[in-house]
Swiss-Prot record:
Encoding gene (name): valS
Single GO molecular function: aminoacyl-tRNA deacylase activity
Subunit structure: Monomer.
HAMAP family: Val_tRNA_synth_type1
Catalytic activities: tRNA(Val) + L-valine + ATP = L-valyl-tRNA(Val) + AMP + diphosphate
Protein name: Valine--tRNA ligase
Entry-linked SUPFAM superfamilies: Anticodon-binding domain of a subclass of class I aminoacyl-tRNA synthetases, Nucleotidylyl transferase, tRNA-binding arm, ValRS/IleRS/LeuRS editing domain
Domain writeup: ValRS has two distinct active sites: one for aminoacylation and one for editing. The misactivated threonine is translocated from the active site to the editing site. The C-terminal coiled-coil domain is crucial for aminoacylation activity.
GO biological process: valyl-tRNA aminoacylation
Organism of provenance: Chlamydia trachomatis serovar L2 (strain ATCC VR-902B / DSM 19102 / 434/Bu)
Gene3D superfamilies, alphabetized: HUPs (3.40.50.620), Isoleucyl-tRNA Synthetase, Domain 1 (1.10.730.10), Valyl-tRNA synthetase, C-terminal domain (1.10.287.380), Valyl/Leucyl/Isoleucyl-tRNA synthetase, editing domain (3.90.740.10)
């Protein structure tokens, strides 16, 4: 074979760019909304324009592309819409840091318009990198439909959705206790707050009862908030305080008189059983304040400092105010003590700041009217969630939904489409271009709300905006909405999935997708190195890479699977992996890991393993090409003479049909790891290690007729074309490269259709590319009765021969002589003999009526068939000596343990577990001895 036509080694770099350009140039990614084919659509979870792709992006997009390619080959009109997300807080934060580092300026040093220009510039650069990387991964997106969550179409959809909900009264504005990030100075939704267990203190503070010498003591983790206290609460059933309910106490420093109230929410066992109520700075206190109509006093500024309601502490930070208040309470004799205490502290997922419950006027979506429909979509299976274990999580989220705070105090994002009158409380919600008519007539009297919408508001409309909503006449919307499936990580089941169901169904009264597949989160292996003091640090660099590749760990280094993090040194860059191993190896690795659990342990060595498989695929195909190079497409069109098919041929066709059936089932439930494993095993084990090895003697002319050889070649070409089709959705680059070589080798397909064996392969060859060829279908032949049982016996006969070779320590390169004794299964043995020779390393196999008397042999039995291997004379003496030594050792051991167990003293005084262990040891030794005796007898 010409080296230029088919190089010995596969080089991903030399083919991937050209293959992708061929696909894109040929328009194979573009969907046709007017097509009569059934639709299959996916909208890409848009990556944030904050940087570059990470391994999570590589995973989710590999899985989507696998589905899209599979469905495209099945004849669906597929539409995969790519896009990017503006990611409000995240992008604004990144750009602010960039401007600080590059220009030494803060956001507030710019006008809003100037700052947003910098963000748009960042977005363009980042988006270009991201989209280029998606192409590198092999994503067959419809780039003509590329979207951005702040493009004009998305902006129109967001304003329309806001107005619809506003007009229905679902969107409202009011004071509410929000999660306030004092660094970013914006409200966060509940699910944007991460909770950490932190060590702190529980402070005990006394309040004096008005007109009494009595004091009441409370325990609190936040003494600085006493400046905003509006009540003390106790349980009505707590006898210690029942006489004080209705009395008043004085708040230190601000001298405010506040009531002591009874409330059943108070846990009498916590602290002293009395708690301070600060409705403006604690969520539980806020509920209590609403129930008892208490005043709500905000004591903090937006930056986390004490405001004018803090009296002498005004202007201090939260931390300094706490210290000063404790010192002042001690001076007044009102501080009792402090105790070590661990509590869950809310932290901003973006800035890391401690979240401050903060009374602020915000925009909200009322969720009560959506709760029933959100449940019904999933309970009725209009939306199916995979894995099904996450259904419970979804329903729990829905049952506990709270009104959604949708306003953010940012500059980057969708501006809230509401105008406020400067002179009264009138507001206008407007979803058109420009501004409302009233504003245009009198612009000095109106101002647009300065806040932007939560990123998830626009992301919640993503499936609709991708297909042209609110234009109800959009062909894309009619053809491709609802989408087939949403593929995303389980960590944003509530962040995004639930909100998409809410927002999309509120707009068009249908679900946004039929299925949801939630993949696990990727974990990488990190290594902690401990010093003599027990302190540790993360190993990085070349040492970490050596450990990843299997180097033994020193005693002071411990490996642990952890979420990917730069600080832990366990981040794996997908682009680096593509450069090192090729996109196909990376895709196959990710698919093979995409189990249905919550965690994906991404072992670095898997990339090496699957790169080896890609090479195996190339080399296996190269071998097949060497034997089908004389074939033409016309030969395949003529079909196959099934009378010339042997047991091994029926076996491989049966295995292929079984593969198709299993893979189809796994696609239907998104078991990507099983799809990858089945395809991998079929090519590597069934096709290459078994079938090719069996038919090599025929291919090389050592056995069989010319007609049988021609049949095998046609079958090989057919199998290769079909397996390339099966593998293509996962490893598209190499399969397309090989498919094009097949087309070039076999030539143009004429009008013939082939037969039930070759017909589909002929049909595939007519296609311009593997990615648009029809997906393989079962190959129909007259399978012989008992096929699987017969081939199973052949495999066990081979295993027995290999086992004898191993036990007898025969040279694996030395061809063996074997014989078979079976009077009842002679015909079956006849068809098994070629398989035994090819796979068992046997030179000859004779069918005998009885064992040869003049030979030394070792014997095994399979289903009543005796199979023997002739041993070389010089081997007999060595093997007998070895077995005799082993026999002597076992006999001594058995004698020793038997005497010990016969001792009544040992049986009564020894630990029962030791006695049982000795009995087990004796039984094992006796079994081993019997095996040795049997082997000696066979010699």
């Amino acid at each position: 074979m010409n080296e230029d036509q088919f190089p010995k080694a596969y080089d991903p770099k030399s083919s991937e760019t050209g293959v992708y350009s061929f696909w894109e140039r040929s328009g194979m990614f573009v969907a046709n909304a007017s097509s009569e084919k059934p639709a299959y659509s996916i909208v890409m979870p848009p990556p944030n324009v904050t940087g570059i792709l990470h391994m999570g992006h590589a995973l989710v997009n590999t899985l989507q592309d696998t589905l899209i390619r599979y469905k495209r080959m099945q004849g669906f009109e597929v539409c995969w819409v790519p896009g990017t997300d503006h990611a409000g807080i995240a992008t604004q934060t990144v750009v602010e840091r960039h401007l600080k580092a590059s220009l030494g300026k803060r956001r507030t040093d710019f006008s809003r318009e100037e700052f947003l220009k910098h963000v748009w510039d960042w977005k363009e650069k980042s988006q270009n990198v991201i989209l280029s990387q998606l192409r590198q991964l092999g994503c067959s997106c419809d780039w003509s439909r590329q979207r951005f969550t702040m493009d004009p179409g998305a902006n129109r959809a967001v304003k329309k959705a806001f107005k619809i909900l506003f007009d229905k009264g679902v969107i409202y504005r009011g004071y509410y206790l929000v999660n306030w990030d004092p660094i970013l100075q914006t409200a966060l939704a509940d699910d944007e707050v991460e909770y950490e267990e932190r060590d702190g203190w529980l402070y005990y503070i006394r309040y004096q009862v008005v007109n009494s010498e009595e004091f009441i003591t409370v325990a609190t983790t936040r003494p600085e908030t006493l400046l905003g206290d509006t009540a003390i609460a106790v349980s009505p059933e707590d006898q210690r305080y029942s006489h004080l309910i209705g009395a008043k106490v004085v708040v230190p420093f601000v001298n405010r008189e506040i009531p002591i109230i009874g409330d059943f929410s108070v846990d009498a066992s916590f602290g002293t059983g009395a708690v301070k109520i600060t409705p403006a700075h604690d969520k539980d206190d806020y509920k209590t304040g609403m129930n008892h109509q208490l005043p709500m006093i905000n004591i903090l500024t937006s930056t986390g400092e004490i405001n004018e309601n803090g009296g002498i502490f005004t202007g201090l930070s939260r931390e300094v105010a706490r210290e000063n208040i404790i010192t002042s309470l001690e001076a007044l004799g009102l501080f009792v003590k402090k105790e070590a205490y661990s509590s869950r502290v809310g932290v901003s997922y973006r800035s890391g700041a401690i979240i401050e419950p903060y009374l602020s006027k915000q925009w909200f979506v009322s969720v009560d009217s959506f709760r029933d429909s959100l449940r019904e979509f999933v309970n009725s299976e209009e939306i199916r969630i995979f894995p099904p274990e996450f259904v419970r999580n979804y329903l729990t989220w829905v049952n506990n939904l709270k009104d959604w705070c949708i306003s953010r105090q940012l500059w980057w994002g969708h501006r809230i489409p509401v105008w406020h009158n400067k002179h009264d409380e009138n507001v206008i919600c407007f979803d058109g271009e420009g501004g409302p008519e009233e504003v245009m007539r009198d612009p000095e009297s109106w101002y647009q709300d300065p806040d932007v919408l939560d990123t998830w508001f626009s992301s919640g409309l993503w499936p609709l905006t991708c297909f042209g909503w609110p234009d109800e006449d959009s062909l894309d919307l009619k053809k491709f909405y609802p989408t087939a499936v949403l593929v995303t990580g389980h960590d944003i089941l509530f962040f995004w999935v639930t909100r998409m169901v809410l927002m999309c169904s509120a707009m068009v009264d249908t679900e946004p997708f039929s299925d949801v597949f939630l993949h696990g989160l990727i974990f990488g292996k990190s290594y902690r190195e401990y010093d003599e003091k027990g302190e540790w640090f993360y190993v990085s660099g070349e040492r970490k890479r050596d450990y990843d590749k299997g180097k033994a760990l020193p005693k002071n280094v411990v490996a642990k699977w952890e979420k990917l993090s730069k600080s832990k040194g366990n981040v794996i860059d997908p682009i680096e992996m593509i450069e090192a191993y090729g996109a196909d190896a990376v895709r196959l690795t990710l698919c093979s890991c995409a189990n249905r659990g919550e965690q994906i342990d991404l072992d670095y060595r898997l990339f090496e393993e699957y790169k080896n498989f890609i090479n195996k695929l190339w080399n296996g195909a190269r071998f097949i090409f060497g034997h089908i190079s004389e074939l033409t497409s016309r030969d395949l069109e003529e079909g196959v003479n099934q009378d010339l098919l042997g047991l091994e041929d029926f076996y491989i066709l049966d295995r292929f049909n079984e593969l198709l059936d299993l893979i189809d089932g796994h696609y239907n439930c998104y078991s990507f790891d099983k799809i990858a494993s089945l395809a991998y095993d079929f090519f590597k084990n069934d096709l290459c290690s078994t079938y090719l090895e069996i038919i090599k003697p025929t291919l090389f002319g050592k056995q069989g007729s010319d007609q049988q050889r021609a049949t095998k070649r046609k079958l090989l070409a057919t199998l290769l074309i079909n397996i390339l089709g099966v593998l293509h959705p996962i490893v598209p680059y190499i399969t397309e490269t090989l498919f094009q070589k097949l087309k070039a080798t076999l030539g143009t397909v004429e009008n013939g259709k082939g037969d039930s064996v070759t017909g589909h392969a002929v049909s595939m060859l007519r296609s311009e590319a593997c990615m648009v060829a029809e997906y393989p279908k079962p190959i129909h032949v007259a399978f012989p009765q008992g096929l699987r049982e017969s081939f199973g016996i052949a495999e066990r006969l081979v295993y027995t021969i290999r086992n004898i070779r191993g036990e007898m320590q025969l040279d694996p390169r030395e061809p063996l002589q074997a014989f078979v004794i079976s009077s009842e299964k002679k015909e079956l043995v006849d068809v098994c003999i070629p398989i035994m020779c090819a796979l068992g390393g046997v030179k000859t196999v004779e069918q005998l009526a009885e064992a040869p008397k003049d030979s030394i042999f070792s014997l095994g039995v399979v289903e009543g068939i005796q199979v023997g291997v002739i041993l070389p004379p010089e081997h007999l003496a060595k093997e007998r000596v070895r077995l005799e030594k082993e026999k002597t050792r076992l006999e001594k051991s058995i004698d020793s343990v038997s005497k010990l167990l016969a001792s009544e003293d040992f049986r009564t005084r020894a630990n029962p577990s030791l006695v049982q262990a000795k009995k087990d040891s004796l039984r094992n030794s006796q079994r081993e001895l019997q095996s040795i005796l049997d082997k000696l007898a066979s010699l």
